[in-house]
């Protein structure tokens, strides 16, 4: 830090037993380092530090994507550590919920990162997660954000957790996500309607060497 930035870490720890990581001798983990800034709207914004871009390796640019009613498209067959940047066209989409199923395994388990149009919130839904807490997290969008007609999501996924940054850090959510054994796919989905994606990039992330 050069003294010009305010950087924080969050602490993630599960509180509902059984705790899957106990068997591996772990107890929680830190979030990504985040820079706190004051937005033009007067609110505090929190987004990953710029140095995170240096961990990107291979990038797949999907460009624009259109999904039909209840459509689904796999964007990664087996993802361990990835970053996803996507912009949803809210005006052109009709889905009640749409987003990403992460840690999607052959047994049908997954964690769902989605925009719920019925409540105007971005959600992390773990009801179908393979293990651990089935908790539900939400981040409300302001009237201004909803009226803008687009939603920007930056989603980080690794082996055991997910972090979601909404509209350049106006909201941030972190959650554990324990997958089943086997390949962990990422799927783009639309529920009860269509989905229009203005842009979507998937970056694989290299390790920082703490294994």
What are these regions (language model features)?
Residues 1-211:
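Beta-rich accessory regions
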């Amino acid at each position: 830090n050069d003294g010009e930035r305010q950087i924080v870490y969050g602490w993630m720890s599960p509180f509902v037993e059984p705790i899957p990581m106990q068997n591996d001798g772990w107890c929680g983990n830190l979030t990504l380092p985040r820079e706190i800034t004051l937005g033009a709207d007067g609110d505090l914004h929190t987004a990953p530090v710029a140095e995170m871009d240096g961990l990107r390796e291979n990038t797949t640019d999907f460009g624009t994507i259109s999904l039909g009613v209840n459509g689904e498209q796999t964007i990664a067959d087996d993802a361990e550590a990835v970053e996803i940047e996507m912009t949803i066209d809210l005006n052109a989409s009709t889905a009640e919920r749409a987003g990403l199923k992460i840690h999607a395994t052959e047994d049908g388990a997954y964690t769902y990162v989605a925009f719920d149009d019925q409540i105007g919130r971005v959600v992390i839904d773990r009801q179908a997660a393979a293990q651990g807490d089935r908790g539900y997290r939400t981040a409300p969008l302001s009237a201004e954000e909803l009226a803008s007609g687009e939603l920007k999501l930056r989603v980080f996924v690794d082996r055991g957790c997910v972090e979601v940054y909404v509209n350049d850090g106006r909201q941030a959510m972190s959650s554990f996500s324990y997958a089943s054994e086997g390949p962990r796919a990422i799927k783009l989905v639309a529920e009860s309607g269509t989905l229009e994606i203005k842009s979507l990039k998937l970056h694989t992330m290299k390790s920082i060497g703490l294994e």
